[in-house]
C-alpha cells in the first residue's frame, strides 16, 4: 500500500461517510492514516463527495480536525450536515465545496445491463420501483418502522414497489427486514 502510495501523485479519499466513529474508531483511524500517509509521501490529497460525521469521541474529533486541516488539499462534501460537522470541529482549511453526491451524477448503466441485473434478482425490469438502501445505526430499531411506512406509502399513493437494496449484505439485509 505505502509503496504504491509513494508512486501516486493524487490520492482521492471518496464517497460514503468514511469520516465517522459510529461504526468503529478503527475505521476512522484507518482513513485518517491513509490521508496522512498520502500527504507524507508527497501526494496531493482530495476528499471527494464525502460525508463527515458523526464523530463523537473528543479525541477522534481533535485527531480528525488536525489531519484534515494539515493534510487535505481539496474537499467536496455531499451535504450541509457534513459542512457543519467540519465547522464545528474547527476545520478552516482547505476551502470546502458543497457538491452533489457522486452517486446521483453518474450516468445510468445501459438499459440492457439494468434489465439483466433486475431479472437476475427476480424483479420485472418493466415495473415501477422505489429503492431503499438501509444501514443499521444505534437506535435504528426504533426508527425502522418509519421506513416501512414510507415504503407502504410509496406503494399505495404512487404504485411504486419497494425494493430494498443491500449495499453491504451482512449489515443491510437485517436493516431491511426490520423495516
What are these regions (language model features)?
Residues 1-179:
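Active-site anion-handling motifs in enzyme catalytic cores
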Amino acid at each position: 500500500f505505502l509503496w504504491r502510495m509513494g508512486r501516486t501523485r493524487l490520492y482521492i479519499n471518496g464517497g460514503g461517510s468514511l469520516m465517522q466513529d459510529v461504526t468503529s474508531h478503527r475505521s476512522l483511524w484507518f482513513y485518517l492514516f491513509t490521508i496522512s500517509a498520502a500527504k507524507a509521501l508527497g501526494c496531493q490529497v482530495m476528499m471527494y463527495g464525502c460525508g463527515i460525521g458523526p464523530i463523537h469521541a473528543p479525541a477522534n474529533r481533535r485527531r480528525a480536525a488536525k489531519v484534515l486541516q494539515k493534510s487535505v488539499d481539496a474537499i467536496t462534501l455531499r451535504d450541509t450536515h457534513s459542512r457543519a460537522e467540519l465547522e464545528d470541529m474547527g476545520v478552516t482549511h482547505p476551502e470546502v465545496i458543497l457538491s452533489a453526491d457522486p452517486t446521483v451524477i453518474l450516468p445510468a448503466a445501459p438499459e440492457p445491463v439494468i434489465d439483466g441485473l433486475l431479472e437476475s434478482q427476480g424483479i420485472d425490469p418493466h415495473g415501477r420501483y422505489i429503492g431503499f438502501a438501509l444501514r443499521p445505526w444505534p437506535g435504528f430499531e426504533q426508527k425502522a418502522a418509519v421506513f416501512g411506512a414510507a415504503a407502504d406509502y410509496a406503494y399505495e399513493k404512487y404504485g411504486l414497489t419497494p425494493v430494498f437494496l443491500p449495499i453491504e449484505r451482512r449489515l443491510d439485509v437485517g436493516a431491511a427486514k426490520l423495516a
